[in-house]
């Protein structure tokens, strides 16, 4: 009973404290408690009003009555029409179509071949695959569709341990090319650091089989750096190919930030140099992407470095970000600037220069000018068109 009375007294006392004017001491302690509670209590966030905001920013009832509603453009539509919000007009291309395009695509699927045209999302696929039979070009990617390196600009899949090379790939590739009747074919490859030879003998065997089935076709191989193993570059240079290509991709200062750490600027130069030293009649070729933040001085120095090793062909193209996971575009270079670099490179003595926003390493590979130069060089050095028969089988067994 005593405990009950005390409890009741406390209840009454508390109720009196609430409803009577508090003393100064109680007011101070209560105000401090209120401030502490406010700090601990999470702030109430304002509810999102996306729909309401969009409705309020749109045309009003008066706009509809006066007929001005049609003049108020939707923000998305405005972005489509604003060149600053979208890709520049010179980077837009038509949708691929045509009989030649679909024939090439069908054979690629049937023979289970990979093409860099598709893997790298090349914007010129419609023009290259859809060209006339003698002018069409295709870039077949050998040694699988998965690379052991991870360059920040490239959309090709990466893996430390990709699948083993398909032993039937050289034969299937040669068969596809003989079907298409191409005048010029480009073979490219992923980097295969997991293979002892970097895939050099596999590439060389593919070139040999193509030349056996269709000796009239000119073959360009866009190879890797073989981790700096120049003996493997020699194997590829002796395979019977017509154009030996290896891309620098960018200027020396940006190479560590753009390419995989295993690829270096000087290493790439040494590969091109070894190819030319192995066979002087070979056309050597490289490509540079612009729009990565390079300076004019850096580009000019790169061209000088290439001329010192007698590189014949250089191409310039705009870097275009494949996905949001890749490095951003620093600048969209204008067509006029590409023309400037074409003229500059030609004045420096390059045999041929392709320069434009949509130019890629294998773009316009079938230019009649390059074909004529290759055939003239072949004639001058007394080479027979049967290059495949001249290849020593031992280079594939080394």
Swiss-Prot record:
Biochemical pathway: Protein modification; protein lipoylation via endogenous pathway; protein N(6)-(lipoyl)lysine from octanoyl-[acyl-carrier-protein]: step 2/2
Residue ranges constituting the Radical SAM core domain according to the UniProt record: 132-351
Catalytic activity from the UniProt record: [[Fe-S] cluster scaffold protein carrying a second [4Fe-4S](2+) cluster] + N(6)-octanoyl-L-lysyl-[protein] + 2 oxidized [2Fe-2S]-[ferredoxin] + 2 S-adenosyl-L-methionine + 4 H(+) = [[Fe-S] cluster scaffold protein] + N(6)-[(R)-dihydrolipoyl]-L-lysyl-[protein] + 4 Fe(3+) + 2 hydrogen sulfide + 2 5'-deoxyadenosine + 2 L-methionine + 2 reduced [2Fe-2S]-[ferredoxin]
Binding site for [4Fe-4S] cluster 2: 147, 151, 154
Residues binding [4Fe-4S] cluster 1: 117, 122, 128, 362
Top-tier EC class: transferase
Domain of life, source organism: Eukaryota
InterPro entries recorded: Aldolase_TIM (IPR013785), Elp3/MiaA/NifB-like_rSAM (IPR006638), LIAS_N (IPR031691), Lipoyl_synth (IPR003698), rSAM (IPR007197)
Protein's name according to its UniProt entry: Lipoyl synthase, mitochondrial
Species this protein is from: Scheffersomyces stipitis (strain ATCC 58785 / CBS 6054 / NBRC 10063 / NRRL Y-11545) (Yeast)
